[in-house]
From Swiss-Prot:
Its EC number is 1.97.1.-. One of its GO terms (biological process) is alkanesulfonate catabolic process. S-adenosyl-L-methionine binds at W40, C41, S42, G144, D193, I194, K195, H267. Keywords: 4Fe-4S, Iron, Iron-sulfur, Metal-binding, Oxidoreductase, S-adenosyl-L-methionine. This is Isethionate sulfite-lyase activating enzyme. It comes from Desulfovibrio desulfuricans (strain ATCC 27774 / DSM 6949 / MB). The gene is islB. Its cofactor is [4Fe-4S] cluster. The keyword Phosphoprotein does not apply. It catalyses: glycyl-[protein] + reduced [flavodoxin] + S-adenosyl-L-methionine = glycin-2-yl radical-[protein] + semiquinone [flavodoxin] + 5'-deoxyadenosine + L-methionine + H(+). [4Fe-4S] cluster 2 binds at C60, C66, C69, C104. Induction: Highly up-regulated in the presence of isethionate. [4Fe-4S] cluster 1 binds at C34, C38, C41. InterPro entries: 4Fe4S_Fe-S-bd, BssD/PflA/YjjW, Organic_radical-activating, Organic_radical_activase, Radical_activat_CS, rSAM. Belongs to the organic radical-activating enzymes family.
């Protein structure tokens, strides 16, 4: 089948040389859009499905020395702040993004998200074929929720496999079941987030209940039993950082012998991007005690044994 390069998706980053998002050395393609609104999200720029204008004031050379962005914005959404840096009025900004960011010589204004074709993305991915061959790596789709852009994600996976590239997806599972079934035959590996087994608690911190997430996990595990799955739980203070929550997830996973499990300690690496987007950091200054994570690792090990992976 010929590649239809008219198939496009909204991509906000392509990251090379990753060793934490699937086996071997991988290239991660980040797609925009997610149905969940997790308070701890480290990629806030991934949540909306459209391109977004952001401001990194540390790169701005000062409005008084430049000011191109003030006149470039067709909506009058950019003004000069007291610190001589741009201020974006989000109530007026249409996220057309391009005029303001294009005229910024220092990249103080930047755009998260760009329409890219399947072939364009895979040309970047193919640059590291030698690394994939030696390490067992390949392409990982991430986000956001990559399967929310269902047809584009499946087209990427299908074409990657046709080019002998191993494929993986990082998913929260909050997508239509048909999309899961369509993507699965083109996957070599799945990283699947299970955040909480209690649907009401899940909804308080992510915005949605978990029934669809758990059902899609069952679909993958039962209908595609030869597909390796790594279930992952981000350990979040005040949400699931307790033995009861982790034990419930581990017991759920135990029914599927080909599924491994990993706990991901909470971190604050994405906080700066919230500021770039003019948003408050939902989690504030909270942190996770390492002793808590170590205790929860033991809880998981007691239930799943060697199927528990310790983060590198």
């Amino acid at each position: 089948m010929c590649l239809d390069d008219k198939q496009q998706g909204m991509v906000f980053n392509i990251q090379k040389y990753s060793v934490h998002d699937g086996p071997g050395i991988r290239t991660i393609v980040f797609l925009k859009g997610c149905s969940l609104s997790c308070r701890w999200c480290s990629n806030p720029e991934s949540q909306k499905s459209c391109a977004e204008l952001a401001c990194n004031p540390g790169r701005c050379i000062d409005i008084s020395k430049c000011g191109h962005c003030l006149t470039a914005c067709p909506h009058g959404a950019i003004t000069c702040g007291d610190d001589d840096k741009p201020r974006i009025d989000r109530s007026h900004c249409a996220d057309c993004s391009i005029p303001c960011a294009e005229v910024c010589p220092a990249q103080g204004l930047l755009v998260y998200g760009k329409k890219r074709a399947v072939g364009d993305v895979l040309r970047v991915v193919e640059q590291d074929m030698a690394f994939y061959a030696r390490s067992g790596g390949g392409l990982t789709l991430s986000g956001g929720e990559p399967l929310l852009q269902g047809s584009f994600a499946v087209a990427l996976l299908r074409e990657a496999r046709a080019r002998r590239i191993r494929t993986a997806v990082e998913t929260c599972g909050m997508v239509p079941a048909d999309t899961v079934r369509e993507a699965a035959p083109h996957l070599s590996y799945v990283l699947y987030d299970i955040k909480h087994m209690n649907s009401e608690i899940h909804e308080t911190q992510t915005g949605l209940p978990n029934a669809r997430i758990l059902e899609n996990f069952r679909i993958l595990a039962e209908e595609f039993p030869h597909l390796p799955i790594l279930a992952r739980t981000p350990v979040i203070p005040g949400f699931n950082d307790n033995e009861k929550a982790v034990a419930a997830i581990a017991r759920f996973i135990k029914a599927y012998p080909h599924v491994n499990y990993e706990l991901l300690p909470y971190h604050r690496l994405g906080t700066q991007k919230y500021h770039f987007l003019g948003r408050e950091v939902p989690m504030g200054e909270v942190s996770l005690n390492k002793a808590v994570t170590d205790g929860l690792q033991k809880t998981a090990l007691d239930i799943l044994g060697e199927r528990v992976q310790i983060p590198r």
